Curated annotation (Swiss-Prot):
Record keywords: Cell membrane, Ion transport, Membrane, Phosphoprotein, Sodium, Sodium transport, Symport, Transmembrane, Transmembrane helix, Transport
Name the UniProt record assigns to this protein: Electrogenic sodium bicarbonate cotransporter 1
Location of the region described as Required for interaction with AHCYL1 in the Swiss-Prot/TrEMBL record: 1-62
Location of region: Disordered: 39-78, 235-266, 1012-1079
Processing after translation: Phosphorylation of Ser-1026 by PKA increases the binding of CA2 and changes the Na(+):HCO3(-) stoichiometry of the transporter from 3:1 to 2:1. Phosphorylated in presence of STK39 and dephosphorylated in presence of PP1 phosphatase; phosphorylation seems to inhibit SLC4A4 activity.
Ranges of the Cytoplasmic topological domain: 1-466, 521, 572-585, 711-725, 808-819, 856-877, 919-960, 987-1079
Cellular component GO terms, alphabetical: basolateral plasma membrane; cell surface; membrane; plasma membrane
Annotated membrane topology: Multi-pass membrane protein
One GO-annotated biological process of the protein: sodium ion transmembrane transport
Basic residues composition-biased segments: 39-52
Membrane spanning residue stretches: 467-491, 502-520, 522-542, 551-571, 586-609, 693-710, 726-745, 780-807, 820-836, 838-855, 878-894, 902-918
Length: 1079
């Protein structure tokens, strides 16, 4: 909707007359609510219909007359059934649409207190229910709160509440400092307006100032002195004629009531743990309902204070009160009063009405808020649902932004995580991203990245001052160390130890620390990748075959590749990232996740091959299984027992000593030592090592299962919230520690983490600096540009796709991205690593996602029954920097790290692979292939896209993923980045296979399509002129229809509860239904 008011076209422009058949043919009638005069004053200056407006009217009339009679009939009927804008919506549009610099209204805590007799005698206000988001009731006999549940209201109570707002006292922005002063003000206002008899003021005041008993309070034992002083009930005192004058009665009773009233919160309030569920700036809304015997007509008041005031023990928790709703009525209708109290309390917990209550100017604004609530309310048939059944709060609440934006003229709601829904078409995935806009200037994007990130540089350090950062450091450190060791070992095998584990550690530490300190997105974790390893292997073999110096050749390739990356930075080539839609991103990230999962199981299977299980072992036949080490020559080498060496002496014994200078008992040798010194292993059990494989799999699967379970422990029902959050944050670290202890207690010799203990190059044939000349012919320096082009594509694709995944809008990053700055530092670090003969590093997808997951922030306070809301990610540079510094220091922590079993770290790899697949739409669609239709979840794209089209899209994605996997597993893996680039071309071809409507829900729309669509919208807006935006989506021409709300017919036939207990008098009991009937 537009923010501007709808132009008054005049009643004669197009008038709809209600037909008798239309009225009689429906079971509901349509009631028009007159727009208050204040609505007219809100409008801007009147404009006479000029030439342009007349032209519009003629054009609309022509369009309308061109349609067939059937279409006109359909439009006529639809205009009756569904008006464009209801009067409530019009008014709320002005209330919520006003530009106001004041902060958003605070969270409300709503409490329902009812006037009840305690022990059958004394009347007190007893808390019976409370709301923040959901309703909690005080159980009848359990003296406990119920579980939070969705409040189910009767439709009749909502209409009675609406009548209460029409008939009762509405007091807005009043000032009061205490509850007695507030009650006095309400009673005086009722008397002034003729709603309360003056002689009833004392009784009403006494009743409203009775003691409030909350669920947190236990029954207090009254002393003997108090028993004689307290009054048995309010009705007994007021029915006694000897009590003296009304003034004296008021003084006495008020003073006795004030004994329990204080402006300061009580100790029980301050100790209430429920305060943890409320934000610091929360305010209270108190609802007081009850029945008394001295009133003939209901006493109704709705009060909004100018400033929230602490009213003592009025509220369960020590928060100031802003709203007060009072309903006292005659005896016999306690249930009706209770339901009305629940209705106003539920309305105050509704986000839209909550805002209206704060901004309302008069009674009509509040009534419009109720009408808007009625427009959105859903009615359940009485015979198909039991109201006593409590509806569990949903896991994800529907956002109220759609309702608010509709009235405030906000942006369209978003779907698919980041794609705005515009009539079925989404906006391009990254096309509207400021960081990816091409500047057209030399290094324009890089300069903008630096200017964007510079103001946040200081906050990137102090934002890490949280216990969550410690958990992230330990988790990512262990993942990085494991990855560095694994990659270093493979790289050593591929390059004949020209680059090994130590180079991997040093390169990871230097590159990662510098990148996290100065890059545009410090949440990205640098690591070595599979395609880089394949390139290193091919390059080493090529250099070996052609007698080239491998490290010098690699140096020039790195320099050329870094130069090309800098050219890409200078020309803003990162704008091409906007063509990486969800299809490309999910294909790449899913592939990397599957690689992590595959490698974890592959390493465990390799471990099982190295430590095989003896499947032929039979219990009770232990004597059949043996293994002995025999000397290579059957000569007696161990005759003398005097010189027999113990196992601890082995390190000092050489092979020559064993054969010539000392006698030796070969039975003390281990399997490895026996083979090393040339002995022979004899026996049928020599190939088997008991328990190691089994124990390794227990550690592997136990670490994974424990990590997953403890990560989800935050939503568990056990332990307090703080403990659950702490366990969830440290889930991976706790899992590693638990299974390290189990491994140590069991004592099985499982393979452990091996870290280099000396700081020196792995190969003795190289140093820490590679000279650029002298090892190869001069033309090799120029020829290196050809393979460097392939490396540049590899670096650019790996880096930018990971950066796009990290910077997705669903992560709610607030400090912006830095695509150009990131690539700049990757190029600089590539130069450094090339000169030092260290591996090249690029953004690692899975570890980066794990880093983000470990730093996700949620609301500290959430209403009972409400899931914590995701606030964003803790954006800072400290965690990544410390992770890589610790990685560099790992050489000196070898004595500690050697106790960590490798199967435990493989379990962490498995966890990272599986966890990074959570929330990926591709995985959700993959599960749909195996699900019957009736069991499929209610995904938004399933509502708008045919299932066969969804399956076709998923099948194409699976096919592309399978081709990438096959390519990765062959020698052609070096062109893997090129094939990732081919995914963009495949996605482009899908525009001819799928409609833009389908792609807007299943994927992101490619920027050109989005750009054209936006240009078309601009043209439409220019043509439409000042017509209301709702008419753009409607088939009906503009008309000034009478808006209406639908009311069931049986409501008009019921006696309003506000009337006296007399026979039905239609003239006296006329409600807003009869006063505002439009037809």
């Amino acid at each position: 909707m537009e923010d501007e008011a709808v132009l008054d076209r005049g009643a004669s422009f197009l008038k709809h007359v209600c037909d008798e058949e239309e009225v009689e043919g429906h079971h509901t009638i349509y009631i028009g609510v007159h727009v208050p005069k204040s609505y007219r004053r809100r409008r801007r200056h009147k404009r006479k219909a000029g030439h342009k407006e007349k032209k519009e009217k003629e054009r609309i009339s022509e369009n309308y007359s061109d349609k067939s009679d059937v279409e006109n009939a359909d439009e006529s009927s639809s205009s009756i059934l569904k008006p464009l804008i209801s009067p409530a919506a019009e008014r709320i549009r002005f209330i919520l649409g006003e530009e106001d610099d004041s902060p958003a209204p605070p969270q409300l805590f709503t409490e329902l207190d009812e006037l009840l007799a305690v022990d059958g005698q004394e009347m007190e206000w007893k808390e019976t229910a409370r709301w923040i988001k959901f309703e909690e009731k005080v159980e009848q006999g359990g003296e406990r709160w119920s579980k939070p549940h969705v409040a189910t209201l009767s439709l009749h109570s909502l209409f009675e509440l609406r009548t209460c707002m029409e008939k009762g006292s509405i007091m807005l922005d009043r000032e009061a400092s205490s509850l007695p002063q507030l009650v006095e003000m309400i009673a005086d206002h009722q008397i002034e307006t003729g709603l309360l008899k003056p002689d009833l003021k004392d009784k009403v005041t006494y009743t409203l100032l009775r003691k409030h008993r909350h669920q947190t309070k236990k029954s207090n034992l009254r002393s003997l002195a108090d028993i004689g002083k307290t009054v048995s009930s309010a009705s007994r005192m007021f029915s006694n004629p000897d009590n003296g004058s009304p003034a004296m009665t008021h003084r006495n009773l008020t003073s006795s009531s004030l004994n329990d009233i204080s402006d300061k919160p009580e100790k029980d309030q301050l100790k209430n743990k429920f305060m943890k569920k409320l934000p610091r700036d929360a305010e209270a809304s108190n609802v007081l309902v009850g029945e008394v015997d001295f009133l003939d007509t209901p006493f109704i008041a709705f009060v909004r204070l100018q400033q929230a005031v602490m009213l003592g023990a009025l509220t369960e928790v020590p928060v100031p009160t802003r709203f007060l709703f009072i309903l006292l009525g005659p005896k016999g209708k306690a249930k009706s009063y209770h339901e009305i109290g629940r209705a106003i309390a539920t309305l105050m917990s509704d986000e839209v009405f909550h805002d209206i209550a704060y901004k309302a100017k008069d009674r009509h604004d509040l009534i419009a808020g109720i009408d808007e609530f009625l427009d959105e309310v859903i009615v359940l048939p009485p015979g198909e649902w039991d109201p006593a059944i409590r509806i569990e709060p949903p896991k994800s609440l529907p956002s109220s932004d759609k309702r608010k934006n509709m009235y405030s003229g906000g942006e369209n709601v978003q779907m698919n995580g980041d794609t705005p829904h515009d009539g079925g078409h989404g906006g391009g995935g990254h096309g509207d991203c400021e960081e990816l806009q091409r500047t057209g200037r030399f290094c324009g994007g890089l300069i903008k990245d630096i200017k964007r990130k510079a103001p946040f540089f200081a906050s990137d350090f102090y934002d890490a001052l949280n216990i969550q950062a410690l958990s992230a450091i330990l988790f990512i450190y262990l993942a990085t160390v494991t990855n560095a060791i694994t990659f270093g070992g493979l790289l050593g095998d591929a390059t004949d130890n020209m680059q090994g584990v130590l180079e991997s550690f040093l390169g990871t530490a230097v590159s990662g620390a510098i990148f996290c300190l100065f890059a545009g997105q410090p949440l990205t974790i640098l690591s070595s990748t599979g395609p880089v390893l394949v390139f290193e292997r091919l390059l080493f073999n090529f250099s070996k075959d052609h007698s080239f110096d491998y490290l010098e050749f690699r140096l020039w390739i790195g320099l050329w590749s870094a130069f090309m990356c800098l050219i890409l930075v200078a020309t803003d080539a990162s704008f091409l990232v906007q063509y990486f839609t969800r299809f490309t991103e999910e294909g790449f990230s899913s592939l990397i996740s599957f690689i992590f999962i595959y490698d974890a199981f592959k390493k465990m299977i390799k471990l099982a091959d190295y430590y095989p299980i003896n499947s032929d072992f039979r219990v009770g036949y232990n004597t059949h299984f043996s293994c002995a080490c025999l000397p290579p020559d059957p000569v007696n080498l161990s005759v003398s027992n005097d010189t027999t060496l113990a196992p601890e002496d082995l390190p000092t014994v050489s092979s020559t000593d064993m054969y010539h200078n000392a006698t030796f008992d070969w039975a003390y040798l281990s399997k490895k030592e026996c083979v090393k010194f040339g002995g022979k292993l004899v026996g049928n059990n020599c190939d088997f090592v008991p328990d190691i494989t089994l124990m390794s799999f227990i550690l592997f699967l136990g670490t994974y299962t424990s990590s997953m379970a403890m990560k989800k422990f935050k939503t568990s029902r056990y332990f307090p919230t703080t403990a659950r959050k702490l366990i969830s944050d440290f889930a991976i670290i706790l899992s590693i520690l638990i299974f390290c202890v189990i491994d140590a207690l069991v004592g099985v010799d499982t393979p452990k983490l091996i870290v280099p203990s000396e700081f020196k190059p792995t190969s003795p044939h190289r140093g820490w600096f590679v000279p650029p000349f002298g090892g190869n012919p001069w033309w090799v320096c120029l020829a290196a540009a050809i393979p460097a082009l392939l490396v540049t594509i590899l670096i650019f694709m790996d880096q930018q796709i990971t950066a796009v995944i990290v910077n997705r809008k669903e992560h709610k990053l607030k400090k912006g991205a830095g695509y150009h700055l990131d690539l700049f530092w990757v190029a600089i670090l590539m130069v450094v690593c090339s000169f030092m003969a260290l591996p090249w590093y690029v953004a690692a997808t899975v570890i980066s996602i794990a880093h983000i997951d470990s730093l996700k922030m949620e609301t500290e306070t959430s209403a009972p029954g409400e899931q914590p809301k995701f606030l964003g990610v803790r954006e800072q540079r400290v965690t990544g920097t410390l992770v890589f510094i610790l990685t560099g220091l790992s050489v000196f922590m070898a004595p500690i790290l050697k106790f960590i079993p490798m199967p435990v770290l493989y379990g962490v790899f498995l966890y990272m692979g599986v966890a990074s697949l959570n929330g990926v739409q591709f995985m959700d669609r993959l599960k749909l292939l195996l699900m019957p239709l009736k069991h499929q979840p209610d995904f938004i794209y399933l509502r708008h896209v045919p299932l066969r089209r969804v399956h076709l899209f998923t099948s194409l994605q699976v096919l592309c993923l399978a081709l990438l996997w096959i390519l990765k597993s062959t020698v052609a893996a070096i062109i893997f980045p090129v094939m990732i680039l081919a995914l963009v071309a495949v996605r482009k071809g899908m525009d001819y296979l799928f409609s833009q409507h389908d792609l807007s829900f299943l994927d992101d729309v490619i920027p050109e399509k989005d750009k054209k669509k936006k240009e078309d919208e601009k043209k439409k807006k220019k043509k439409k002129g000042s017509l209301d935006s709702d008419n753009d989506d409607s088939d009906c021409p503009y008309s000034e229809k009478v808006p209406s709300i639908k009311i069931p017919m049986d409501i008009t036939e019921q006696q309003p509860f506000l009337s006296d207990n007399k026979p039905l008098d239609r003239e006296r009991s006329s409600t807003f239904l009869e006063r505002h009937t439009s037809c």
